């Protein structure tokens, strides 16, 4: 199954419309005839853990500052936990993921930051959408590139 992860629901819907509509489900759009599902983010779904997470005992004191861990831990934002679970479950079914974040660095990061947290290591591609009109989406879908380009 091919899974598109869009930056927001309106982008997911624009992609689905060009691909034939699909059926809305809880947190994604299913296009079974194409073996494709489209899900979305709502801005950044993850956030860095608070400083207390990194300090033994969980209480930050002056002597702990600044708190700079070797690696920052990202966790789902409270309001985004349900959508993160939807994406995690869909990734388990996916053979390929298409990053459909906005055509800028932030759009790239917004989707890419999910992959290590949700343990996705499979094939990942990227489309660049400059507009959501039908012709722009159709052209973007014809120009799928590797995610690292």
What residue ranges belong to the model's regions?
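Intrinsically disordered, low-complexity regulatory segments
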Residues: 1-149
């Amino acid at each position: 199954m091919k899974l598109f992860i869009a930056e927001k629901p309106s982008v997911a819907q624009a992609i689905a419309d060009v691909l034939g509509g699909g059926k809305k489900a809880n947190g994604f759009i299913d296009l079974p005839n194409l073996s494709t599902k489209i899900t979305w983010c709502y801005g950044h779904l993850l956030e860095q853990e608070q400083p207390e997470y990194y300090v033994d005992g969980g209480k930050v004191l002056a002597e702990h500052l600044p708190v700079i861990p070797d690696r920052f831990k990202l966790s789902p934002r409270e309001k985004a936990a349900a959508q993160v679970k939807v994406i995690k479950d869909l990734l388990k079914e996916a053979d390929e993921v298409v990053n459909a974040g906005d055509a800028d660095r932030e759009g790239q990061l917004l989707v890419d930051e999910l992959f290590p947290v949700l343990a996705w290591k499979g094939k990942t591609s990227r489309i660049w959408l400059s507009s959501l009109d039908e012709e722009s989406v159709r052209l973007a879908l014809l120009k799928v590139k590797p995610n690292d380009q």
